């Protein structure tokens, strides 16, 4: 018997699927150059066509706050159960919440 692999994208067939209109589209320049301030609230929306800076699928749809910037990525604090996690996520995978 062969041991079944459990990679980072297992069980994500529907979760990371794009709609036919979005398929093949690369993130727009505005989305890549998104300037987020510390303390802003964001939603993690994974863009499956960009692999760098992609958070784990368990964080898809979670709301977090920006702690700071680390290189091209942002540090995002997310509450998961009763714990708080700090993720390092690229801006392609973040959506700003309009206040």
Curated annotation (Swiss-Prot):
Single GO MF descriptor: structural constituent of ribosome
GO biological process, alphabetically ordered: translation
Paired cysteines (S-S): none
Keywords per UniProt: Ribonucleoprotein, Ribosomal protein
Residues covered by region (Disordered): 1-26
Biased composition (Basic residues): 1-18
Superkingdom, natural source: Archaea
Annotated Gene Ontology cellular component terms: ribonucleoprotein complex; ribosome
Classification via InterPro entries: Ribosomal_eL21, Ribosomal_eL21_arc, Ribosomal_eL21_CS, Ribosomal_eL21_sf, Translation_prot_SH3-like_sf
Family: Belongs to the eukaryotic ribosomal protein eL21 family.
The protein's name in its UniProt record: Large ribosomal subunit protein eL21
Native species: Metallosphaera sedula (strain ATCC 51363 / DSM 5348 / JCM 9185 / NBRC 15509 / TH2)
Gene: rpl21e
